[in-house]
Amino acid sequence: MRSGVIAQKVGMTRVYNDAGEHIPVTVLRLENCQVVSHRTEEKNGYTAVQLGAGRSKVKNTPKAMRGHFAAASVEPKAKLVEFRVSADNLIDIGAELTAGHFVAGQLVDVTGTTIGKGFAGAIKRHNFGGLRATHGVSVSHRSHGSTGSNQDPGRVWKGKRMAGHMGQTRVTTQNLEVVSTDEDRGLILVKGAVPGSKGSWIVVRDAIKSGTPEGAPRPAAVRAAESK
């Protein structure tokens, strides 16, 4: 099991394939995605790598985190994410991952925080049909209807779909195709839409349902850490 990467959502555009068909893609950018720490079976009980991405000003970084980054000889990061990996896929601390970590045609799972929509009714939030236009319905055409049963169970069931805050939740979209990558500019082009707003942090992993393709680099596509 390989590590994923932390990317930033740039936006959407389109590209054309060899047949002249346009493909809607989301552009994801890797910015200083480096290994900050390890988790090992002996010390932590599991194996993982901690990646950091982006840049954070030193004055805005807590002292404890400054020491954490200094131990890895990397600049303070804006985002930290931990990825479970197998022991043979551990990556050296300080190594920088590139867009070549993924290959064109492979499937990936993309995780992000959806755009918040605020308080929404049941029709918008859950695609309810609403009540009838006439026949006794008055001023409640867009309500969700009954909230439950009678004296038994005498309460509203957990998970009942009702009006409430819509969006701003952690969502994973599975099996998106990698259309192409640009290693020099650190870009990954993924077919279709990706959860999150422009500029938000996105986590990209090998698709759990299809696994790692044969042509993918192991343990990762890395740019050697700069010597100090």
Curated annotation (Swiss-Prot):
InterPro entries, A to Z: Ribosomal_uL3 (IPR000597), Ribosomal_uL3_bac/org-type (IPR019927), Ribosomal_uL3_CS (IPR019926), Transl_B-barrel_sf (IPR009000)
GO biological process: translation
Gene3D superfamilies per the UniProt record, alphabetical: 3.30.160.810, Translation factors (2.40.30.10)
Modified residues (N5-methylglutamine): Q151
Keyword Transmembrane belongs to the record: no
Keyword Zinc recorded: no
GO cellular component, one term: cytosolic large ribosomal subunit
Disulfide bond entries: none
GO MF entry, a single one: structural constituent of ribosome
Post-translational modification comment from the UniProt entry: Methylated by PrmB.
A Pfam family of this chain: Ribosomal_L3
NCBIfam families from the UniProt entry: L3_bact
Subunit structure: Part of the 50S ribosomal subunit. Forms a cluster with proteins L14 and L19.
HAMAP family in alphabetical order: Ribosomal_uL3_B
Listed name of the protein: Large ribosomal subunit protein uL3
Organism: Rhizobium meliloti (strain 1021) (Ensifer meliloti)
Taxonomy of the source species: Bacteria, Pseudomonadati, Pseudomonadota, Alphaproteobacteria, Hyphomicrobiales
